[in-house]
Swiss-Prot record:
UniProt superkingdom: Eukaryota
One GO CC term, this protein: nucleus
Keywords: Activator, Nucleus, Transcription, Transcription regulation
UniProt protein name: Mediator of RNA polymerase II transcription subunit 27
PANTHER family in UniProt: 34 KDA TRANSCRIPTIONAL CO-ACTIVATOR-RELATED (PTHR13130), MEDIATOR OF RNA POLYMERASE II TRANSCRIPTION SUBUNIT 27 (PTHR13130:SF4)
Bridged cysteine pairs (disulfide): none
GO biological process, one term: regulation of transcription by RNA polymerase II
Signal peptide (UniProt feature, chain positions): none
GO MF annotation terms: transcription coactivator activity; transcription coregulator activity
Cellular compartment(s): Nucleus
Amino acid sequence: MDKLNSTLTAVKNLRSNVRLCFEHLADGTDGESGEESRNKFVNDFQERFAAINSQIREVEQLINGLPVPPTPYSLGNTAYLAQETSQDRQALYPQLVNSYKWMDKVHDHSFLAFNNLNQNTLRRSYNYCSQKRQRLPFSSFNNDPDHIDKLLSEINTPPHTSYRIFRPFGTNAVTIVTISNVMKAAIVFKGVLIEWVTVKGFDEPLEHDDLWAESRYEVFRKVQDHAHSAMLHFFSPTLPDLAVKSYITWLNSHVKLFLEPCKRCGKFVVNGLPPTWRDLRTLEPFHEDCRNC
């Protein structure tokens, strides 16, 4: 390591003297045109040049005296840093070195903290607990396939609402809810939890092969957006049956979608649309702009 430091110091001195020599050549004479001034300039340059030659020989001797490593140093991907030319990427190497130093400090401090905590004589009750508390099973996904059929049959639905249940995805049910002659809604279940809702007009097809296609009517696309908001509002993994019943009740409130005026402005149509929003508690109709007023 001492030889390497001496070599680096010699290279540094050589570079400094070469820079001074070129600065001396760039400055030239003092402006005097006399023979004495020119001779002095030439003599100074020869002395500097001779000193540079001697330093070059010294650097060569020091380099030849360095021990050759048995194997090349493994730099990994950092070897590619020398190929970068842009200024914003050249600053990566010192940041990388600082990161490695920081990681080493974190490792050392963590090791010391681990040893100190192991030497602590205080005991906690959980150290002697032989059995861990087990989580309660999440049963909203693991229900009987006929549970949805029983659940929908228990809901007090008005006569204008009908249900049709099929299972194109195995045990998970898809329910087509037809609300009078107003609209249809396809509710995709995962267990007892509602995962997706598609709303279309009464005259539009809604089968298992087009559950993800939106309605061609803007009013039902708005109702579908509100249905997704209500789906998140009524979501309850702990009480999934109550969540489904509440959601179906909210969905049935659209039976008078085109017959009830807005509770705030009293108008039937605003911006070409009826009041598409139903309050989540009172089920009162509102226009989308009026509900935020």
